[in-house]
């Protein structure tokens, strides 16, 4: 036979050099062939193949040097072996060679090989640990040669113990001195040689380490005596049953696995003394004898396998049954892990002794072992010594990594992975089926978790702590983990409410902060203005649209840009923009602001208020030092709407480039990450809405931006800021700014009640009013028509037709205002049907859509825009010639701002307003606006005004106050507090007060009310009536436990005439009639007596929950998870009824869920999970509704 003896000169070896170039080409082919059958020929389960990926990363650094040493020793041998093996990889000789292993049978297909390890369990044990460790080394070699060697070594490993015994001695002799042609057997035998190398290293490391430990522990004799004692005590019990796999031991030299020691000590007790000898490896049998003994004793001694938790010190004891159970339930059951950890802590702690081993000694031992040849492995001891050496080698490698750097925790975490993997690879249990059932990923993760925990305790122990203290720590950590994994569904409400809580800014104590000084006043009165007396100044102000000022020492108005005290760069930009001279508000406001005064500026729409506060801000910023890293802005501009913020930011841009400044526009609806990135790069100016500014200040614990350097604050459209609900947010932001700041307020309308509120933020302000507080510009032609509702759309089409019929108005724009979001979308649909290209904008749209719509409208892509009052402020379109109030504004200021969208910057425009007979209340403000702007009031409108005033005098109507009348955020805070109190009382957190139930019922929070229904668990009919809880329907107790009913089985009817039976039947009829109401009342068991009914059942009504909550408990994915976890049956029954509708007498009950199970426990668990899903779905529905409300007149932006 060609390959009978595996001689050093096999057939085909002469082609070694010529075929060397095929190494990389054949690698993929051989890997594919080996994948099909290689692992099964090696008697190893498929799991070993799956472990390769993380084995490769684990020991790459550790074994690379040892592999290179062996490569240098056997490099020439491999050259010939590779080529020979490649040539004869699938040859007849190979099959002949395998005949000895397979009892002279031909090569079998891979399909039959799958079950071979079950019937050759004895042969599978031979050299298993050698084989696994050799694979690891070959995998970690980066060269192509090593990869080829890895595949061949894996294939060579398929040799059974019979061949191994007969040929290993013959192979090992010529391994080192053989010429290159005579190295074939060395290459084919590389895996066994690697295994011998590994065991030799472990032995040498064991001896060297134990010498130092024995020196500190009192010598080797005490340990040997303890080993003998343990062996004799356990010998009788172990010999009567099937021996369990050997267990990987801890690093302690004082204790070994009793089962392994007992089995070996019974046969060879006299060899135990070798463990305490010198570091030199004792002489034992050759490698072939070791392999033979392994094959012969495979039924008596099982290979090593780690059955305890892998730690930084060693291994804890754990039975095979416990390991199997833990591997199957690793992800859910923490009980086994806790038990194993406690067992681990009962072992002696060798951490301090291990750390005493010098790193250099350990490394030196490894180098010494690597330099030894294959012949040195013949000095290996008995199987007992080999097992001890394996344990010691693993511990030695751990010490080496830990001694390199104790501070780095990553290496100790990786080392337990190495220990567990090595032992898994080097030792396998005898039962193949049990072995295959163990998931390698679960075993790996379990070992990693335990190892990390033990490493942490090891460092605690090094800080002079008792040895047994880590056991208590383990228990504490387990308790924490279990509690975190098993949190109640009620806790989810607290978590959700915590996430929903608005971000809050801490209160700043300005007295403790040392602000750097800054200069406010930059204005020097020109000589020509200083010569004017009071009469001339009054006449000048009258010429400038009747400027009215109030305050102390107000500067005189300027007439030219050169008198404002601005810089050269700013004046150049003004000249390029075509601003010839200041407007009325600019001529008075710029000198006042440049003087460092706080200013309230009220001017008509389109009068240039934005430039009036921007130009002084640029001069203010340029006077201060440049921004440094992580410093906040100097100028802060807050606006009520996002559109106004973007418009102000655009007006800043021409000046920013010339002055080398940066500005950031921050508003809600846009991605906050982009705004944060711009702020971190540094910006002197922030144009923002209050809500987003608070988000930015609170983001990342306040490290995104700050208000330390803010000295110039602008509130544009200030009245809207305070009455639209921004007052708490604005005051919160302003309270974080230095008190010596300069604050400027501008608006086109400023009611008296808003003025008192705004003055809280100012210091001795100068009030400037141009043309009246709430006046429409005279350039705007105002038309008010009283007409029925059904004629407004026809009149709208007529107005649009007249506008675009004129060729001069080809590029004109039209803006239509409505009062509600739904009306905007409906009017958009109607106009599109009539052929007018248009778009709509309102608070319910995304910010991206709103921005693009306004840009398209300004660019003329579509000429008609339909909007709510969200576009009434700040929208500046030069070509806008027609404004139509399709729905009349409800107060004066809104009318002024709507009409002010046209006729801007001296241009003319038209504003048409539709009034219906029912809108007498609104006619008063419109008539007032007409009078103040110098226009006549139509007769029909005046009649409506007189009629309404008569009703007010008679008490039938109440006069409406001026202004928007926003309720602010106090109402929202009150509702939130009421919801929190209701929640506390509902779940009995111990913080609830004695609030009146009826008062709490008046508080309407839809999300919390729906959530209250989430715990509608079925209670027993005999249970006492629960106490009424606010917000919870009658008969439902959130704190009541889940009651599971025992299903009644149908019994054969009896024909007796017992009076008690008649009474029972009458009661049953009454209950049946009552149940026909169709409502699944709490505590009423269902009529479920069929043969397929479960022994226990419970019901959960879901009809009144929002759609998201119902979907959460009825979708197939969630239900399947519950069914798999509990083994119950979940059925959706009944019919869905909309809110407010109740089922009729003969109709199905409301939608509910039926849960059936064999035990009360599984039904309870399923009900608890369903209730948790209901709560989450209810809260999610409430959140989504809060983020995007269905409708609303105004939106807090």
Swiss-Prot record:
Positions of short motif Q motif: 559-587
SUPFAM superfamilies: P-loop containing nucleoside triphosphate hydrolases (SSF52540)
Alphabetically ordered keywords of this record: ATP-binding, Helicase, Hydrolase, mRNA processing, mRNA splicing, Nucleotide-binding, Nucleus
Boundaries of every Helicase ATP-binding domain copy: 590-768
GO BP annotation list: mRNA processing; RNA splicing
Motif DEAD box, residue numbers: 716-719
GO MF annotation list: ATP binding; ATP hydrolysis activity; nucleic acid binding; RNA helicase activity
Domain of life: Eukaryota
Reaction(s) catalysed (UniProt annotation): ATP + H2O = ADP + phosphate + H(+)
Biased amino acid composition, Polar residues: 233-251, 402-426
Biased composition (Basic and acidic residues): 23-37, 51-112, 120-129, 151-172, 185-213, 321-341, 968-991, 999-1011
Binding site for ATP: 603-610
Domain (Helicase C-terminal): residue spans on this chain: 795-945
InterPro entries named among the record's database cross-references: DEAD/DEAH_box_helicase_dom (IPR011545), Helicase_ATP-bd (IPR014001), Helicase_C-like (IPR001650), P-loop_NTPase (IPR027417), PRP5/DDX46/KHDC4_KH (IPR056149), RNA-helicase_DEAD-box_CS (IPR000629), RNA_helicase_DEAD_Q_motif (IPR014014)
Record family assignment: Belongs to the DEAD box helicase family. DDX46/PRP5 subfamily.
Domain writeup: The Q motif is unique to and characteristic of the DEAD box family of RNA helicases and controls ATP binding and hydrolysis.
Name of the protein: Pre-mRNA-processing ATP-dependent RNA helicase PRP5
């Amino acid at each position: 036979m060609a390959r009978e003896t595996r001689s050093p000169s096999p057939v085909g070896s002469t082609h070694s050099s010529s075929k060397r170039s095929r190494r990389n080409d054949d690698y993929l082919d051989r890997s594919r062939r080996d994948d099909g059958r290689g692992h099964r020929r090696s008697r190893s389960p498929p799991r070993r193949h799956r472990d390769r990926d993380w084995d490769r990363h684990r020991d790459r650094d550790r074994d690379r040097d040892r592999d290179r040493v062996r490569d240098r020793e056997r490099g020439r041998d491999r050259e010939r072996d590779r080529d020979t093996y490649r040539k004869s990889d699938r040859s007849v000789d190979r099959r002949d060679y395998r005949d000895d292993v397979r009892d002279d049978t031909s090569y079998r297909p891979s399909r039959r090989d799958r079950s071979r390890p079950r019937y050759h369990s004895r042969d599978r044990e031979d050299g298993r640990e050698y084989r696994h460790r050799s694979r690891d080394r070959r995998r970690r070699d980066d060269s192509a040669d090593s990869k080829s060697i890895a595949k061949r070594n894996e294939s060579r490993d398929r040799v059974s113990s019979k061949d191994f015994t007969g040929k290993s001695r013959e192979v090992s002799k010529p391994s080192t001195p053989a010429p290159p042609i005579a190295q074939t057997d060395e290459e084919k035998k590389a895996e066994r040689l690697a295994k011998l190398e590994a065991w030799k290293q472990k032995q040498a490391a064991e001896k060297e380490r134990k010498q130092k430990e024995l020196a500190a522990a009192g010598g080797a004799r005490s340990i040997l005596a303890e080993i003998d004692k343990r062996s004799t005590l356990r010998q009788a019990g172990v010999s009567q049953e099937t021996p369990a796999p050997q267990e990987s031991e801890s690093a302690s030299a004082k204790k070994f696995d009793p089962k392994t020691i007992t089995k070996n000590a019974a046969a060879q007790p006299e060899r135990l003394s070798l463990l305490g000898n010198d570091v030199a490896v004792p002489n034992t049998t050759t490698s072939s004898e070791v392999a033979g003994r392994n094959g012969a004793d495979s039924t008596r001694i099982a290979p090593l396998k780690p059955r305890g938790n892998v730690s930084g010190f060693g291994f804890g004891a754990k039975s095979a049954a416990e390991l199997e159970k833990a591997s199957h339930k690793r992800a859910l059951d923490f009980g086994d892990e806790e038990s194993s950890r406690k067992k681990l802590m009962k072992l002696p702690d060798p951490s301090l002794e291990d750390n005493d081993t010098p790193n250099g000694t350990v490394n030196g031992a490894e180098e010494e072992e690597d330099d030894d040849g294959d012949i040195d492995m013949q000095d290996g001891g008995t199987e007992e010594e080999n097992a001890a050496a394996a344990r010691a080698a693993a511990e030695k490698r751990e010490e080496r990594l830990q001694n390199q750097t104790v501070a780095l925790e990553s290496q100790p975490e990786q080392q337990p992975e190495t220990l567990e993997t090595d032992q898994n690879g080097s030792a396998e249990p005898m039962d193949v089926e049990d072995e295959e059932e163990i998931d390698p990923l679960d075993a790996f993760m379990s070992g990693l978790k335990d190892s990390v925990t033990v490493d942490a305790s090891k460092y605690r122990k090094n800080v002079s702590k008792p040895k047994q203290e880590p056991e208590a720590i383990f228990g504490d950590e387990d308790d924490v983990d279990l509690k975190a994994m098993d949190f109640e569904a009620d806790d989810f409400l607290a978590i959700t409410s915590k996430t929903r809580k608005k971000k809050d800014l801490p209160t700043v104590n300005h007295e403790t902060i040392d602000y750097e000084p800054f200069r406010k006043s930059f204005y020097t009165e020109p000589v020509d203005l200083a010569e004017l007396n009071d009469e001339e100044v009054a006449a000048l102000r009258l010429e400038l649209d009747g400027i009215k000022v109030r305050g102390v020492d107000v500067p005189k108005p300027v007439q030219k840009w050169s008198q404002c005290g601005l810089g050269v760069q700013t004046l150049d930009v003004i000249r390029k923009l075509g601003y010839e001279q200041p407007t009325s508000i600019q001529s008075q406001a710029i000198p006042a602001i440049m003087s460092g005064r706080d200013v309230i500026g009220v001017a008509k729409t389109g009068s240039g208020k934005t430039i009036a506060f921007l130009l002084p801000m640029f001069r203010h910023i340029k006077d201060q030092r440049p921004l440094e890293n992580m410093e906040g802005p100097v100028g802060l501009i807050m606006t009520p709407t996002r559109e106004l913020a973007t418009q102000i930011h655009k007006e800043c841009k021409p000046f920013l480039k010339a002055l080398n400044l940066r500005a950031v526009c921050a508003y809600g609806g846009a991605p906050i990450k982009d705004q944060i990135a711009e702020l971190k790069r540094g910006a002197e100016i922030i144009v923002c809405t209050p809500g987003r500014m608070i988000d930015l200040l609170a983001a990342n614990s306040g490290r995104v931006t700050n208000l330390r350097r803010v000295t110039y604050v602008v509130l544009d459209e200030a009245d809207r800021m305070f009455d639209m609900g921004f007052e708490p947010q604005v005051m919160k932001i302003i309270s974080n700014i230095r008190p010596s700041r300069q604050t400027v307020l501008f608006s086109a309308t400023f009611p008296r009640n808003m003025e008192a509120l705004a003055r809280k933020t100012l210091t001795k302000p100068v009030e400037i009013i141009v043309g009246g507080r709430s006046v429409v510009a005279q350039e705007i032609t105002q038309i008010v028509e009283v007409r029925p509702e059904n004629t407004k759309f026809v009149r709208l089409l007529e107005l649009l037709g007249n506008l675009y019929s004129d060729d001069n108005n080809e590029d004109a724009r039209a803006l239509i205002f409505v009062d509600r979001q739904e009306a905007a979308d409906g009017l958009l649909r109607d106009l599109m049907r009539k052929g007018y290209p248009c778009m709509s904008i309102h608070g319910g749209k995304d910010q991206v859509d709103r921005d693009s719509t306004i840009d398209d409208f300004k660019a003329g892509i579509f000429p008609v825009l339909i909007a709510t009052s969200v576009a009434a402020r700040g929208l500046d379109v030069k070509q806008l010639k027609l404004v139509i109030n399709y729905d009349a504004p409800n107060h004066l200021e809104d009318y002024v701002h709507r009409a002010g969208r046209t006729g801007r910057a001296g241009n003319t425009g038209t504003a048409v307003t539709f009034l219906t007979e029912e809108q007498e209340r609104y006619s008063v403000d419109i008539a007032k606006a007409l009078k103040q702007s110098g226009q006549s009031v139509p007769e029909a409108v005046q009649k409506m005004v007189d009629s309404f005033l008569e009703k007010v005098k008679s008490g039938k109507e109440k006069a409406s106050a001026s202004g928007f009348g926003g309720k602010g955020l106090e109402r929202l805070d009150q509702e939130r507090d009421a919801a929190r109190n209701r929640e506390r009382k509902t779940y009995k957190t111990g913080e609830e007060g004695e609030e009146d139930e009826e008062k709490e019922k008046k508080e309407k929070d839809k999300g919390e009310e729906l959530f209250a229904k989430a715990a509608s668990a079925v209670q027993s009919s005999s249970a006492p009536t629960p106490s009424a809880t606010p917000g919870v329907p009658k008969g439902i107790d959130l704190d009541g436990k889940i009651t599971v009913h025992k299903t009644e089985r149908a019994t054969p009817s009896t024909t007796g005439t017992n009076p008690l039976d008649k009474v029972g039947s009458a009661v049953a009829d009454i209950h049946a009639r009552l149940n026909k109401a169709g409502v699944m009342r709490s505590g009423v068991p269902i009529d479920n007596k069929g043969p397929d009914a479960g022994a226990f059942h419970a019901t959960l009504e879901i009809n009144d929950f929002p759609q998201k909550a119902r979907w959460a408990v009825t979708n197939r994915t969630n239900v399947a998870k519950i069914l798999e976890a509990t083994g119950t049956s979940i059925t959706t029954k009944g019919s869905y009824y909309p809110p407010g509708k109740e089922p009729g007498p003969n109709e199905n009950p409301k939608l509910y869920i039926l849960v059936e199970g064999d035990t009360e426990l599984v039904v309870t668990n399923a009900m608890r999970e369903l209730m948790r899903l209901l709560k989450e779905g209810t809260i999610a529905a409430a959140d989504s509704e809060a983020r995007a409300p269905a409708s609303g007149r105004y939106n807090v932006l």
